[in-house]
Curated annotation (Swiss-Prot):
<keyword id="KW-0816">Tricarboxylic acid cycle</keyword>
<dbReference type="InterPro" id="IPR024176">
    <property type="entry name" value="Citrate_synthase_bac-typ"/>
</dbReference>
<dbReference type="GO" id="GO:0019679">
    <property type="term" value="P:propionate metabolic process, methylcitrate cycle"/>
</dbReference>
<dbReference type="GO" id="GO:0036440">
    <property type="term" value="F:citrate synthase activity"/>
</dbReference>
<protein>
    <recommendedName>
        <fullName>2-methylcitrate synthase</fullName>
        <ecNumber>2.3.3.5</ecNumber>
        <ecNumber>2.3.3.16</ecNumber>
    </recommendedName>
</protein>
<dbReference type="InterPro" id="IPR036969">
    <property type="entry name" value="Citrate_synthase_sf"/>
</dbReference>
<dbReference type="InterPro" id="IPR002020">
    <property type="entry name" value="Citrate_synthase"/>
</dbReference>
<dbReference type="InterPro" id="IPR016143">
    <property type="entry name" value="Citrate_synth-like_sm_a-sub"/>
</dbReference>
<keyword id="KW-0808">Transferase</keyword>
<comment type="subunit">
    <text>Homodimer at low concentrations and converted to a larger oligomers at higher concentrations.</text>
</comment>
<feature type="binding site">
    <location>
        <position position="369"/>
    </location>
    <ligand>
        <name>substrate</name>
    </ligand>
</feature>
<dbReference type="GO" id="GO:0050440">
    <property type="term" value="F:2-methylcitrate synthase activity"/>
</dbReference>
<feature type="binding site">
    <location>
        <position position="350"/>
    </location>
    <ligand>
        <name>substrate</name>
    </ligand>
</feature>
<comment type="pathway">
    <text>Carbohydrate metabolism; tricarboxylic acid cycle; isocitrate from oxaloacetate: step 1/2.</text>
</comment>
<feature type="binding site">
    <location>
        <position position="200"/>
    </location>
    <ligand>
        <name>substrate</name>
    </ligand>
</feature>
<comment type="similarity">
    <text>Belongs to the citrate synthase family.</text>
</comment>
<dbReference type="GO" id="GO:0006099">
    <property type="term" value="P:tricarboxylic acid cycle"/>
</dbReference>
Amino acid sequence: MTDTTILQNNTHVIKPKKSVALSGVPAGNTALCTVGKSGNDLHYRGYDILDLAEHCEFEEVAHLLIHGKLPTRDELNAYKSKLKALRGLPANVRTVLEALPAASHPMDVMRTGVSALGCTLPEKEGHTVSGARDIADKLLASLSSILLYWYHYSHNGERIQPETDDDSIGGHFLHLLHGEKPTQSWEKAMHISLVLYAEHEFNASTFTSRVIAGTGSDVYSAIIGAIGALRGPKHGGANEVSLEIQQRYETPDEAEADIRKRVENKEVVIGFGHPVYTIADPRHQVIKRVAKQLSEEGGSLKMYHIADRLETVMWETKKMFPNLDWFSAVSYNMMGVPTEMFTPLFVIARVTGWAAHIIEQRQDNKIIRPSANYTGPEDRPFVSIDDRC
């Protein structure tokens, strides 16, 4: 037992954190994911994230979450073929995207694109599991198309063809972004990153999706709500801020000196610590290796060395460990991903987890309606309007 966790009936309970509302309070049951049961572990449907990230393509993990099992090779090939065929955008969705200004927040574009798709290809009445899975697959396949169709049209007037022959979601994203097939190394890096971001239990956006699903609403509405929650800087965007921090400096020494001063001044350094993990973020060790490999291949280790030095500084000064976002920033930057697309990439990965939770919440078939602790005044006498001061 540590000062941060307690064990009750063999169940790991997180000691509440003052900065996180409802921290440590169970809000429902799930068979999809466990986070931090031992302080630094993560499992999707019982599988260790380290095994999944090491051995699986992202599409395997998407199938695990959305369809309930790791696919056989034949099932994986069929699933990837299905996703390839779903990358296109209906004409009216493209029209909506063309109307959005270049200054739009990419997360607003994602939200709007999903809403337009939901109007064009609405969920059928009855809300079947198979129908929800089909919508999840359509979104998984076409979110990159939504983002990058808007991006290229709004920035240079180009109407790209969103369908490519790339074998993976990550490869499709990079191909649409850069206009050419990515290297195998970049595609592998995307597989790993998307796997790491795919699911994370009852985080704010996932819980939002479950609350909406619990009302009996459609899949699109639940996903749109989740995107809205992830847009908030207290939930999404940490890897964007992480890169901004890393890019302030020219050398690791400069970075260390400045961050030590900021820590002394009690400034918050984004990219470190976690509301649930108490020992380490298990995803960190994986993405750090990816960041180093990409940096070495790109012939530029500057950002990696700065990030690595600050990892040491934050542990020495605050005993705070880096989370997934810290070296994801380095990885995405080395693949030429614009900073404003970091959180939309989070959406592309997490739509798999959101969809799985929506389906699970529907099967529970209960509306989520918690109580509140009232903190207002009691038993106030009513004063008519003419007598009020």
